[in-house]
Design a protein with these regions (language model features):
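A structural signal for short, hydrophobic/glycine-enriched beta-strand patches
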Residues: 61-203
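Secreted/extracellular small peptides and ectodomain modules produced from precursors
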Residues: 12-15, 117, 132, 217
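N-terminal type II signal-anchor transmembrane helix
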Residues: 29-66
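Structural signal for membrane-spanning alpha-helices in multi-pass inner-membrane proteins
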Residues: 58-62, 81, 213, 217
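Secretory-pathway extracellular proteins and peptide precursors enriched for disulfide-bonded cysteines
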Residues: 4-9, 110-115, 125-126, 209-212
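N-terminal Lys/Arg-rich, disordered targeting/topogenic segments
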Residues: 2-37
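Short alpha-helical segments used as structural interaction elements across diverse proteins
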Residues: 32-35, 82, 209
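A transmembrane-helix-recognition feature enriched in membrane-embedded lipid enzymes
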Residues: 198-219
């Protein structure tokens, strides 16, 4: 209330401001809520898919079916040819499961035959009659290894092989080798395990590689 004669002071009006319209604000709020709901739904769907993929991969990459060793024509060490994997193959040979070991090696770097103690200068049997052959698949991938072993099996008359690799690789390697060789494939774990810091990366890599192998078979 103002006294008689007092001047009424009005706040200056903004010449450049949009007029205040409650109806406009009422329309904006529902739109914003709708966008938020859609964003939350998309996030929820992405999380659900990630969980589903992770759960689906457990029996393939964390708890795969590992074959019981039995006598085969050759034991195949899949790359990279690390010491633990080679030693696992040598132990299987020492237990009488095969007299032939094939080690997949690269043509350069730390995985080249020249840098691997288990690779002999020739393929002559050792004192125990064990033949170790270090061969370069083209390309140096699981698919390349399967193609290489398929050709070896045809040339040597092999009917069975036992592949040695890490636990996350077993399911995919068995599938690819079985596709190429048509059967007679065993897959065993090298026993080396996976470091905790590498599990997420290995899981993602093997998942993508498994899907690729399903979509584009090797043989």
């Amino acid at each position: 209330m103002t006294a008689a004669g007092d001047a009424v002071v009005h706040a200056p009006q903004c010449r450049f401001c949009a007029p205040h319209d409650s109806r406009t604000l009422n329309r904006v709020k529902p739109r914003r809520r709708a966008r938020n709901k859609r964003a939350l739904a998309a996030i929820g769907l992405a999380v659900a898919l990630a969980v589903a993929v992770a759960l689906a991969g457990l029996p393939l990459f964390v708890f795969p079916s590992i074959d019981e060793p039995r006598e085969v024509d050759a034991i195949v060490v899949l790359g990279p040819p690390r010491d633990a994997r080679i030693h696992a193959a040598q132990q299987l040979a020492a237990e009488g499961y095969s007299d032939t070991i094939v080690i997949a090696v690269d043509d350069y770097g730390i995985d080249a035959a020249i840098n691997i103690d288990a690779c002999p200068p020739d393929a002559a049997p050792d004192e125990a009659g064990l033949v170790t052959r270090c061969l370069i698949p083209e390309p140096f991938t699981t698919a390349g290894e399967a193609i290489m072993v398929e050709r070896l099996a045809a040339a040597e008359g092999w009917e069975s092989v036992m592949i040695v690799t890490n636990v996350t690789h077993i399911s995919r390697a068995r599938m690819i080798f079985t596709d190429c060789l048509g059967g007679g494939v065993l897959a065993v774990d090298d026993g080396a395990g996976i470091e905790d810091s590498n599990w997420a990366w290995m899981y993602a890599y093997q998942s993508a590689a498994f899907v690729k192998a399903l979509v584009a078979p090797t043989c």
